[in-house]
Design a protein with these regions (language model features):
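Preferential activation on post-signal-peptide N-terminal prodomains/segments
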Residues: 1-144, 148-155, 159-161, 165, ...
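Compositionally biased, intrinsically disordered linkers/stalks adjacent to structured regions
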Residues: 200-247
């Protein structure tokens, strides 16, 4: 949803979401080699590919690391926007390490230490946390803790975030950054969305774009998630993912069809 002023909204279709959700590509202006520093250590790598990550205004260039699995940089300023540390040596250390009794507490400490390098944690509030059970190379049980630190505007998430993954042995697995540099623009433009009723706009979108001309919305739409973002074209938008259930009316009097849930973003 994009608002030019408080009374003018529009629903983006096709082009923008294809750009954000498109496949990776080779960028002709990406440096063949790059180096970044994190935690006092320098990581070097060879260019692999690029993509517009969902909700970011910039292109991310990805590099296959010499001493990490991969890292990403902001194409506009060369800043580090993420590292995955999972090399063969990482897996060996992981298998040799022991499970921590206070695994969750230690994981959060590690995640906060990482995120604090990039964002003021007091501006994010409490992170959302998810736990994924998995195993190490030897097959031993292990948990992966995923932390999401996010700045919000009027209770709505923004793409100014830091996502951190830590295993139950206290090892930092990876981190990735959203569009931190665009928060000020999102904040400045947010007043233009004050009168916007997201639920109403989503309902209009379903009524206008759903593929069943004989269908009627019988449930929803329910918004799964919404967040502020800045497009690659420099416009502040609210991206909302929602789903609704339609009742399909058949033209054949002898045929019937159950309601069918349809999702839209």
């Amino acid at each position: 949803l994009q608002s030019k002023d408080s009374a003018d909204t529009a629903v983006y279709e096709g082009e923008l979401m294809s750009q954000w959700g498109g496949a990776s590509f080779k960028a002709s202006d990406a440096p063949a080699k790059a180096s970044v520093t994190y935690g006092g250590e320098t990581y070097t790598g060879t260019y692999r590919d690029s993509e517009y990550r969902m909700g970011n205004s910039y292109i991310t260039h990805y590099y296959t690391g010499d001493n990490c699995y991969e890292f990403g940089i902001n194409s506009e300023n060369g800043k580090l926007v993420g590292i995955n540390f999972q090399t063969e040596s990482f897996y060996k250390k992981e298998s040799a390490a022991s499970e921590l009794r206070n695994a969750r507490e230690r994981a959060e400490e590690v995640a906060r230490e990482c995120a604090a390098n990039f964002v003021n944690l007091e501006e994010c509030g409490e992170p959302t946390v998810s736990v994924v059970p998995l195993g190490d190379e030897s097959g031993a049980a292990m948990d992966l803790y995923q932390y999401f630190f996010c700045r919000k505007l009027n209770g709505i998430e923004t793409r100014a975030y830091v996502a951190v993954r830590v295993n139950s042995r206290g090892m930092l697995v990876s981190f990735s950054l959203g569009d931190l540099d665009s928060f000020d623009k999102m904040e400045a433009d947010s007043a233009r969305f004050d009168s916007l009723n997201i639920e109403d706009e989503i309902r209009k979108a379903f009524q206008n774009i759903h593929p069943f001309p004989n269908g009627t919305i019988v449930e929803g739409p329910d918004i799964d998630r919404a967040f502020y973002a800045v497009t690659p074209q420099g416009e502040t938008v609210i991206i909302a993912a929602a789903q609704a259930t339609f009742s399909l009316q058949q033209t054949d009097e002898n045929s019937t069809q159950d309601t069918e849930p349809i999702g839209a973003g």
